[in-house]
Each structure stands twice: as C-alpha cells, then as structure tokens.
Amino acid sequence: MYQITRITDKEGVAKAEGAYLAHQGCVGDAKMEDGCVLFHCRYDRRGKPCNRYIRTSIVQDWKKDKVTGQIVVETMNSVYYMDPVRTGT
C-alpha cells in the first residue's frame, strides 16, 4: 500500500486545487492501467475508510527508490509522490 504524500506540477510547485488536495494523504493500492496509474484509495488523509478511485493522466515516466520504496510518477500534467505504508497484515 502507498500514501500519496505530494502532488506537484512539472516545475515542482505544489498543486493547491481542491481535487488535488483531496487526493493528498490517501492510502491505498496503485497499479498501471491503460498507461495511467489507477490508485484505489482505501483510507482518506484522516485515516477514515473510503472506497474511491483516482486515475492519473498518461504516465510519461516513473521511478522507484530502492532504499525508501518511494515511487515518483510523472504524468503529462503532474508529478505524484507515493510513499510505502506498512500495514499490520
């Protein structure tokens, strides 16, 4: 599971629009589907259960840090930073 910790534009400026702010802090599963990242949000940023999906625009590049496990996904419009979340299961 991963948590969306930050969403920026291509220049690194944090996105402050409502939809982007609502996505930050979500915890869930991420997978590639049709060239996009489909993020199944299982918990909102307050830790309350939710069951929604977030789909990015077309992915141009992504990198996974081998030490921290952080994934950085660069889309046509945004950069998503996702940190691994350890679960008790």
Language-model features, listed with the residues they occupy:
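N-terminal non-globular leader segments, chiefly Sec-dependent signal peptides
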Residues: 1-67
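Short, compact, well-ordered microdomains
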Residues: 56-89
